Amino acid sequence: MEITSKIVLIILLVVMVAASIALYHSMFHKAKNAYDKISFRETMNLAGLPIVTFRQGESKFNFILDTGAFSSIIDYRVLDKLQYTELEGKSIGYGIDGKEHSISRVGIVLTYKDKDYSDVFRVLDMSTSFDALKRDYGVTVHGLLSSSFFERYKYVLNYNELIAYSMV
């Protein structure tokens, strides 16, 4: 009986080790099997920033991926080039001066590789920041995608492969 118990124990250990290796392998290579991938490799190589180009019709719009931002932002200067829906009610924001500001919100649908993405954007004057990015890095930025976007679409940023991916 003792030999049988040892054999069963060894088999169980081998199965557990194999299952652990399989789990590690699937977790490590998740991004390769992701359902949706958004690459930011090119802009990381050029500017050191995670920027993705989306389309609306024939027009292209560049967005910084910012998981730390509270809400997505669109520069007011590009609204005339976009189709959007004005949303009722304003959001409240605070300027660098500490004063409260009323901010317009719009709903925008953008496309990346034949998949549509929608988000709510605060409309702000981003000319100082975005013009500095253009001057210093040579990249035109039209907006910023925030944590709300990543939460809605269950995206994770993978800086090893320079992609945002979703498993849902």
Each language-model region and where it sits:
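Pepsin/retropepsin-fold aspartyl endopeptidases
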Residues: E2-V168
